């Protein structure tokens, strides 16, 4: 065994959090995708970390790579998620120089391969692989229970998607007993609607063997979906699908990030952030109570600590420290922390990055496409219309 055994654990979670998030454009110019703010007071990484803590999994590795500073600062020692533990806890795992050289993480499987030594310190029976950029709540302990009952070598969480969307996902074709007989990566003509969520439980000793073999394969993309899962199926390993029926969103695009924030404003919020039985925790700065001015009007919106609102806010999400000036109208928008919206501004269907300033009289968005303003950007000019910052349909 490589390294020193610290303490034997039944399961270790590994969160893949090094993604650049290029489809989020200017929002990830200076930070990793899992560190992008979400839902008024969270960052995306809070969801897998909270799920781990709520599931009783207290040994977690977070694999970082692209622009990790904000992400590292946010996670800290893990106390927000009860992961500040001497016996396990949370560990930040960037790529590093080893005796035989080093390299960036080349794929999801390679990222885990490069951290075999970390996993071996805990000699686990199972390893849980998670994406750091999905919004959902899941009890991983129930998934592990099914993995054991089925005596599986690997269990993959799947969610039912509409048939017309299935070609966008990795699709698991299963038998009646949920055993997987075929995996198709973004098939042109899908045979089922069981989409992989990128959540895996593996028997560690079996996964380690496949990771080591995959690393020697020069033609491999070193990816779980493209390489490891198909190779396990072809070798006759027992793979099981774990159906998930709750809310799940891959917020890897401007459109999906905006939609996920808007979903929180529905009367019956599927994600249910108010559920006291399964809380989503986040490291938040101490802010004064929000202030609502005498002429302010707020409808169907989330506003949090430190907000000052003098204008009109409708169907929008305002993060900490947002200022909305007199006569300003904010509609169908996501306004990230510490952004200042001056008097008589009109914002409609937009995402405004952190610490931006939208100057007096500006107009952003036309209500059709999603407009995006980068963090710390200053939008100036009386009645200037900003429409081409980062549009999606």
UniProtKB/Swiss-Prot annotation:
Positions of transmembrane segments: none
GO molecular function list: ATP binding; glucose-1-phosphate adenylyltransferase activity
Swiss-Prot/TrEMBL catalytic activity: alpha-D-glucose 1-phosphate + ATP + H(+) = ADP-alpha-D-glucose + diphosphate
Binding-site list for alpha-D-glucose 1-phosphate: 105, 170, 185-186, 196
EC number: 2.7.7.27
Cited InterPro entries: ADP-Glc_PPase, ADP_Glu_pyroP_CS, GlgC_bac, GlmU/GlgC-like_hexapep, NTP_transferase_dom, Nucleotide-diphossugar_trans, Trimer_LpxA-like_sf
BP GO annotations: glycogen biosynthetic process
Known pathway: Glycan biosynthesis; glycogen biosynthesis
Subunit structure: Homotetramer.
Protein family (similarity comment): Belongs to the bacterial/plant glucose-1-phosphate adenylyltransferase family.
Known function: Involved in the biosynthesis of ADP-glucose, a building block required for the elongation reactions to produce glycogen. Catalyzes the reaction between ATP and alpha-D-glucose 1-phosphate (G1P) to produce pyrophosphate and ADP-Glc.
Protein's name in the database: Glucose-1-phosphate adenylyltransferase
Organism of this sequence: Clostridium perfringens (strain 13 / Type A)
Upper lineage: Bacteria, Bacillati, Bacillota, Clostridia, Eubacteriales
């Amino acid at each position: 065994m490589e390294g020193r055994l610290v303490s034997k654990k039944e399961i270790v979670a590994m969160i893949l959090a090094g993604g650049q998030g290029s489809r989020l454009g200017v929002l990830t110019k200076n930070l990793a995708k899992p560190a992008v703010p979400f839902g008024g007071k969270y960052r995306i990484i809070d969801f897998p970390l909270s799920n781990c803590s709520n599931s009783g999994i207290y040994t977690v590795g977070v694999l970082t790579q692209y622009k990790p500073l904000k992400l590292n600062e946010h996670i800290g020692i893990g106390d927000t998620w009860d992961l500040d533990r001497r016996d396990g806890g949370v560990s930040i795992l960037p790529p590093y120089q080893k005796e035989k050289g080093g390299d960036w993480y080349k794929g999801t499987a390679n990222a885990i391969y490069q951290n075999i030594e970390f996993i071996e310190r805990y000699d686990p029976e199972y390893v849980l692989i998670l994406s750091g950029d999905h919004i959902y709540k899941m009890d991983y302990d129930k998934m592990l229970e099914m993995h054991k009952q089925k005596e599986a070598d690997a269990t993959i969480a799947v969610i039912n998607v509409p048939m017309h969307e299935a070609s966008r996902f990795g699709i698991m074709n299963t038998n009646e007993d949920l055993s997987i007989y075929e995996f198709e990566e973004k098939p042109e003509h899908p045979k089922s609607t069981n989409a992989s969520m990128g959540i895996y439980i593996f028997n560690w000793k079996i996964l380690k063997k496949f990771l080591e073999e995959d690393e020697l394969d020069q033609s491999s993309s070193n990816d779980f979906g493209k390489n490891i899962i198909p190779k396990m199926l072809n070798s006759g390993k027992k793979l099981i699908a774990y159906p998930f029926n709750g809310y799940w969103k891959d917020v890897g695009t401007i459109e999906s990030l905006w939609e996920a924030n808007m979903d929180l404003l529905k009367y019956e919020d599927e994600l249910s952030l108010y559920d006291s039985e399964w809380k989503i925790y986040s490291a938040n700065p101490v802010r004064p109570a929000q202030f609502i001015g005498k002429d302010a009007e707020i409808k169907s919106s989330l506003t949090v600590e430190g907000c000052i609102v003098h204008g009109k806010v409708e169907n929008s999400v305002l993060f900490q420290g947002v200022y909305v000036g007199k006569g300003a109208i904010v509609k169908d928008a996501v306004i990230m922390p510490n952004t200042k919206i001056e008097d008589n501004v009109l914002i409609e269907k937009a995402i405004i990055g952190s610490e931006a300033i939208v100057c007096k009289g500006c107009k952003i968005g036309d209500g059709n496409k999603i407009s995006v303003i980068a963090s710390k950007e200053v939008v100036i000019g009386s009645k200037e219309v900003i429409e081409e910052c980062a549009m999606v349909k």
